[in-house]
Design a protein with these regions (language model features):
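N-terminal helix-turn-helix
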Residues: 1-37, 201-209
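Residue-level recognition of specific faces of alpha-helices
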Residues: 3-6, 21, 59, 156, ...
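Short, acidic, Ser/Thr-enriched surface-loop or helix-capping motifs
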Residues: 11, 63, 166-167
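Amphipathic alpha-helical effector-binding/dimerization core
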Residues: 17-116
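A short, flexible beta-alpha/helix-coil linker loop
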Residues: 23-25, 119-120, 180-184
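Short helix-to-loop capping/linker segments positioned immediately adjacent to catalytic or ligand/cofactor-binding
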Residues: 45-50, 58, 121-127, 143-150
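Cysteine/selenocysteine-centered motifs that mediate thiol-based redox chemistry or coordinate metal-sulfur cofactors
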Residues: 112-121, 200-216
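Extended hydrophobic
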Residues: 126-200, 204
Length: 216
């Protein structure tokens, strides 16, 4: 049942509980509780891990239609003012957290989510506003291995994000880091993305049931 995603081990709690697959017959929000429980500790560790690079907020997000819904947030001791909060929804086409999940979806599904120009939202004058420009960006980010936005949501604020996957290999949630644009150059952003990727892999491992212990 663990391999199928119906039960999951919560290492920090030292017990077993219902997994993501057990909730798939219900409304989408019912899946969030096991996902949050599995991801909370890795997200907290991620925020601590990158603190020496730059103050960055670690976020866990999921797709909710054309929006990114944020489920977890771990903020650094040095404040970083961002729009994303737990429970907040932002345009998936603009957020790194949303696009890293869109990049793993079939092209037909992305097309269905963004059928026309009215499907796109403009916040700062930056970011994709057509399906063609979105697909070009998704292609670049798919090749790079992470999504990135700079000023698409808030001017002066940037993010990187990587997708984690469920027991069937489908994009389940995004692991993102948000920081001030002027406090992370290209090299630093690559390091942040690598840290987010390690965290996303840990969450994928937990979701897929490929081991019960915490990350070493």
């Amino acid at each position: 049942m663990e391999d199928a995603g119906f039960v999951a081990h919560y290492p920090e709690e030292g017990r077993w509980g219902l997994g993501v697959a057990a909730f798939e017959v219900g409304a989408a929000y019912l899946r969030h509780d096991p996902l949050e429980r599995l991801a909370r500790a890795p997200i907290q560790r991620l925020a601590a891990e990158v603190a020496h690079i730059t103050p960055a907020v670690a976020l866990l997000g999921v797709l909710h239609g054309r929006e990114t819904l944020y489920l977890l947030k771990d903020a650094p001791s040095t404040p970083v003012t961002i729009v994303a909060e737990v429970g907040v929804r932002l345009p998936a086409s603009l957020t790194a957290s949303g696009r890293t999940l869109l990049a793993d979806l079939p092209a037909a599904q992305v097309r269905a989510l963004f059928p026309n120009a009215a499907s796109f939202v403009d916040r700062t004058g930056a970011g994709p506003m057509t399906l063609r420009s979105l697909n070009l960006l998704l292609g670049e980010e798919r090749l790079r291995g992470w999504a990135e936005e700079d000023g698409f949501i808030s001017e002066g604020v940037a993010s990187v994000a990587v997708a984690s996957h469920d027991h069937d290999g489908r994009p389940a949630a995004s692991v993102g880091l948000t920081f001030r644009s002027d406090q992370a150059d290209r090299g630093a952003r690559a390091v942040l993305a690598a840290a987010a990727r390690r965290c996303a892999r840990e969450i994928t491992r937990r979701l897929s049931g490929s081991g019960a212990g915490p990350r070493a």
